[in-house]
Regions:
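Residue-level detector of anion-binding/catalytic polar loops
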Residues: 109-110, 185
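Asp-based, Mg2+/Mn2+-dependent phosphohydrolase catalytic module
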Residues: 1-9, 117, 121-213
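Conserved phosphate-coupling serine/threonine residues in phosphotransfer and NTP-handling enzymes
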Residues: 113-114
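Conserved dinucleotide-binding and phosphotransfer motif residues
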Residues: 106-107, 182
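Short glycine- and Lys/Arg-enriched binding-loop motifs that mark or flank ligand-binding interfaces
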Residues: 13, 110, 166-168
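N-terminal helical cap/lid subdomain that shapes the substrate entry/recognition surface
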Residues: 3-98, 102-106
């Protein structure tokens, strides 16, 4: 493995849907807010609602569901009382993720760029990911979260690299849009979004990173 050469100086991961299968935890979180306000649960057949709650930042999701609701501030305040660790039982790590990190570490720098705000440090600790990522960019660190390119541009600035020297792996439109706007090569993970490659397993990502140009 030491003889392998990475195509990229930095590999950047989205969190939800790439590192973690967390869709159920997102439904649980926002349905608790709905229940607090006496509103019906989110329709799981509503693809647009699923897309928003799974990929957008907390503030953007709350605006999506509660814009115009006179209890909007109550919804925000209650949501902030829900602790991440209450949702952890509804999350699981994507198969093969740690193995992929073990293969990549030492050959390329690793980073995270997520629309999560305050829970990422706990996720890294609770899922045994401490020590893998040199830089973690969250929605709380930027003025404009994904789909704006600001988070990815800040990652590039941290590593002092050109956009083409990074690879961003995401599963949502916000990831694709941010990557395109920042000029960063994009891999679509378990989705059919337009991308440099559409891959289903983390082992395939490793193969791509070490493949010949």
């Amino acid at each position: 493995m030491n003889k392998l050469k990475s195509r990229y100086k930095v590999v950047i991961y989205d969190c939800d849907g790439v590192i973690l299968d967390s869709i159920e935890s997102n439904y649980v979180f926002y349905n608790r807010v709905m229940d607090f306000l006496g509103r019906p649960e989110i329709d799981r057949d509503n693809d647009d609602a699923k897309r928003v709650l799974h990929t957008y930042s907390f503030n953007d999701v709350m605006e999506y569901f509660f814009v115009g609701d006179p209890r909007r501030e109550d919804a925000f305040n209650f949501a902030k009382t829900i602790h991440y660790r209450d949702l952890m039982p509804y999350m699981r790590m994507e198969d093969g993720f740690v193995s992929a990190l073990d293969q990549l570490k030492g050959h390329t720098s690793l980073a995270i760029c997520t629309n999560r705000a305050t829970s990422m440090d706990m996720i890294i600790e609770d899922f045994g990911l401490t020590g893998y990522f040199e830089y973690v960019m969250t929605a709380s660190q930027v003025t404009n979260p994904k789909p704006h390119p600001e988070p990815l541009l800040k990652v590039l600035d941290y590593f002092k690299i050109a956009p083409e020297d990074a690879l961003f792996i995401g599963d949502g439109e916000v990831d694709m849009q941010a990557a395109n706007s920042a000029g960063v090569p994009f891999i679509s993970y378990k989705s059919h979004l337009p991308a440099l490659a559409r891959l289903q397993h983390h082992a395939e990502i490793v193969q791509h990173v070490f493949s010949n140009l």
